[in-house]
């Protein structure tokens, strides 16, 4: 078996990346280990674009296996794997949300990224899953604007980098911060905490940034040594007619519809309807590109107005929250309790018996 191994210090312990011919038909693969936790990541892309696809067909799977614990649980060992656990679903989403923004959204080739937990120790595999997926993609020929890194910052009495399950399962564990990003740009955050100060959150982010930078450099070194040359998937060209139609039909009403001051989405729906009618005579490919073009323009102006003018589409400033309302009871004397909570247009009724 051919192997090539790279290692670095990560949170005071060894992070190990191994390349073997175990999965040599995948376009990219690697084994990543941290303590006794080991994950395998594979990345594959179809040769041709998916017929009729008007979206980027990326699939991310996070697979847990019974054997990873080194135990046979229960009196009857089930040979079949069941549905994914909540933790597996959430870990898969962490990987997806981290890597997806770094693909060009005009790609129509099927891409699959599968992370399999081979061994589970005291370290959570979700951080390793992000790193393994990034390295598998980065060393493959699949076009991707990575690498991207991940780190967990915890706080008991002191801040800890990549705390173990034991360290996290204590009464005074105050903060669990998972940060993913690249080149001092963060594209995914998950945090669960008690009532910690803003200073603690900021310190955790600063610690995360330093670790992300170190792992970014580590990945870049690996990719420079063994990474394959990326293939090029040219961006489909938008017809000049689409630009002209946008200027005629959308430009005059664009800002008033996007920044309507209405917390609902009626105006945006109207904008999409007007645009869909304007491009209805175009072929399917140009219609798909035109819809992407509209969404890009909406995203662009929302980002610009939020940063430059501190303005949100519903009229709020960036430091304003939606109106809040809460009420106890008011449903019936028969039920034991009820509560109503509003945050803007989101209304929740909870009933207890």
What is the predicted role of each segment?
Residues 92, 126-130, 198, 202:
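Amphipathic alpha-helical transducer elements in NTP-driven molecular machines
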Residues 98, 128-140, 204, 211-212, ...:
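Stable alpha-helical structural segments in soluble proteins, enriched in small hydrophobic residues
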Residues 26-117, 190, 201, 338-353:
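Glycine-rich, flexible beta-strand/loop modules in the N-terminal catalytic cores of phosphate-handling
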Residues 141-259:
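Mobile "lid/hinge" segments at catalytic clefts and subdomain interfaces of large enzymes
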Residues 67-81, 119-126, 225-248:
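Short, surface-exposed loop/turn segments at secondary-structure boundaries that line and modulate
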Residues 16, 40, 95, 105-152, ...:
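Glycine-rich anion/phosphate-binding loop at the beta-strand->alpha-helix junction
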Residues 1-46, 50, 54-57, 234-353:
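Extended amphipathic alpha-helical scaffolds
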Residues 1-12, 89-95, 132, 152-153:
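A short, contiguous, amphipathic alpha-helix enriched in charged residues
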């Amino acid at each position: 078996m051919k192997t090539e191994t790279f290692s670095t210090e990560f949170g005071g312990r060894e992070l190990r990346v191994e390349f073997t011919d175990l999965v040599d038909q995948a376009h990219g693969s690697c084994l990543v280990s941290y303590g006794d936790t080991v994950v395998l990541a594979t990345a594959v892309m179809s040769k041709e674009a998916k017929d009729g696809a008007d979206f980027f067909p990326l699939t991310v799977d996070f697979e847990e296996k019974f054997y990873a614990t080194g135990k046979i649980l229960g009196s009857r060992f089930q040979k079949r794997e069941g549905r994914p656990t909540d933790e597996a679903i959430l870990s898969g989403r962490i990987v997806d949300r981290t890597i997806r923004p770094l693909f060009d959204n005009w790609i129509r080739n099927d891409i699959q990224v599968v992370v399999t937990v081979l061994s589970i120790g005291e370290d959570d595999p979700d951080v390793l899953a992000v790193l393994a997926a990034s390295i598998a993609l980065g060393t493959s020929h699949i076009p991707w604007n990575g690498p991207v890194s991940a780190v967990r910052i915890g706080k008991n009495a002191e801040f800890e980098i990549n705390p173990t399950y034991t360290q996290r399962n204590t009464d005074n564990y105050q903060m669990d911060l998972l940060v993913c990003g690249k080149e001092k740009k963060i594209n995914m955050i998950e945090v669960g905490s008690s009532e910690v100060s803003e200073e603690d959150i900021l310190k955790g982010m600063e610690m995360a940034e330093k670790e992300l930078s170190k792992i970014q450099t580590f990945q870049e070194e690996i990719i420079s040594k063994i990474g394959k040359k990326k293939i090029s998937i040219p961006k489909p060209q938008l017809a000049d007619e689409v630009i002209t139609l946008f200027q005629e039909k959308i430009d005059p009403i664009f800002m008033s519809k996007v920044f309507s001051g209405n917390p609902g989405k009626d105006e945006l729906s109207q904008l999409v309807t007007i645009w869909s009618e304007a491009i209805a005579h175009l072929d399917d490919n140009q219609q798909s590109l035109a819809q992407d073009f509209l969404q890009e323009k909406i995203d662009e102006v929302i980002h610009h107005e939020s940063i430059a003018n501190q303005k949100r589409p519903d009229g709020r400033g960036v430091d304003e929250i939606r109106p809040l309302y809460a009420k106890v009871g008011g449903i019936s004397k028969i039920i034991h309790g009820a509560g109503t909570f509003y945050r803007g247009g989101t209304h929740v009724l909870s009933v207890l018996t």
